[in-house]
A protein has these predicted regions:
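DNA/chromatin major-groove-contacting recognition/catalytic segments
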Residues: 4-5, 299, 303-318
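N-terminal core-binding DNA-recognition domain of tyrosine recombinases/integrases
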Residues: 29-131, 258
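C-terminal catalytic core of tyrosine-transesterase DNA break-rejoin enzymes
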Residues: 161, 165, 268-291
């Protein structure tokens, strides 16, 4: 059964943003410089930017256009409580809290504040997943292969099988450039992953063929992709494809194979689980996923084999 998505809260208003406390906007500009120096991905910066601007508009609307330097723990808790009342689920709430916390960490680093007002605000405990986790079977992967071939969009083929066989996170996939490919060894190098890790994303022989077909197609059509692997009408030399666009592609692929809740992260879950079913050990799967340890892999990425557990229990007579 699908889990209902968190209600989308959109405070963004161009006119109100012009009225936001100028000090807040200047601090945000400084934060942008800091994020640029740290070489955060464009999508990460975009996420922080959206979260912080929505908060600034709340400060303008509900809290007398308060400066973030003067906001107290109570002021910020009021914002979190308001979001919860509007329908945010735990996962979305945690992301907003993380964005504001990171901003205050920057302000403290720059000695603009002595204490962070969010330091002692507890994060909500683990809640329901934003969307259902889908574990694709070998049969569904084969069906996906057939349906995509029939559909005839080579970019969609390349995306699906690169995401699946590389097990890369959506943000890493979105930011891939052709210059990062080692064709002989079949991997993308110097890939920026979660928490600033630099990793390799290896891919299958089948994926290599799709990527080569994609290059040939663009050359024949005279399409300038600005060096990015994946392309949409909104991609520019400095702006990669948006994560939301990749998620839309996932929905399209999911609809083809009878999995309407399919989303980007499901490719990671699915390939990890398929590897497990083929006898690959947990440590190797964890390394493929670029996890720091096996705990996360086991808890969040591998589907529990309840049938095997029942068989073990039935084999013991007490």
């Amino acid at each position: 059964m699908a889990v209902e998505r968190s209600k989308r809260i959109n405070l963004y208003d161009e006119e109100k943003l012009k009225q936001v406390n100028p000090e807040n906007m200047k601090l945000l500009e400084k934060y942008h410089i800091d994020m640029s120096i740290r070489d955060l991905s464009p999508n990460t910066v975009y996420g922080y930017n959206v979260d912080l601007k929505q908060w600034f508009i709340f400060l303008y609307d509900k809290q007398f256009n308060l400066s973030v330097l003067e906001a107290t723990e109570d002021d910020i808790e009021e914002y979190y409580f308001w979001r919860k009342q509007q329908g945010n689920n735990v996962n979305r709430q945690k992301r907003v809290m993380a964005s504001i916390s990171a901003f205050y960490k920057f302000l403290r680093k720059k000695k603009l504040i002595t204490e962070s007002p969010v330091e002692f605000i507890d994060r909500p405990k683990e809640g329901q997943a934003v969307v259902t986790q889908t574990y694709l079977t070998k049969e569904e992967v084969q069906l996906m292969r057939e349906k995509l071939e029939e559909y005839g969009d080579v970019q969609l083929q390349a995306y699906a099988f690169l995401s699946l066989t590389s097990m890369g996170r959506v943000n890493a996939i979105a930011n891939l450039k052709w210059s990062q490919i080692n064709w002989d060894e079949r991997f993308f190098g110097d890939v920026l992953e979660k928490e600033g890790k630099i990793v390799e994303l290896s891919f299958s022989l089948e994926t290599k063929e799709y990527l080569q077909k994609l290059i040939k197609y663009r050359e024949e059509k005279g399409i300038d992709d600005y060096g990015w692997v994946f392309l949409s009408p909104y991609v520019t030399p400095d702006k990669p494809i948006n994560n939301g666009t990749l998620n839309d592609w996932c929905k399209k692929i999911g609809a083809m194979i009878g999995q309407p809740t399919l989303h980007c992260h499901d490719f990671r879950h699915s390939y990890a689980n398929l590897m497990k079913s083929e006898g690959v050990n947990l440590e190797d799967i964890s390394t493929m996923l670029n996890h720091s340890g096996t705990d996360v892999t086991k808890k969040h990425y591998l589907k529990q084999d309840t049938k095997k557990i029942r068989e073990i229990k039935d084999s013991i007579s007490i």
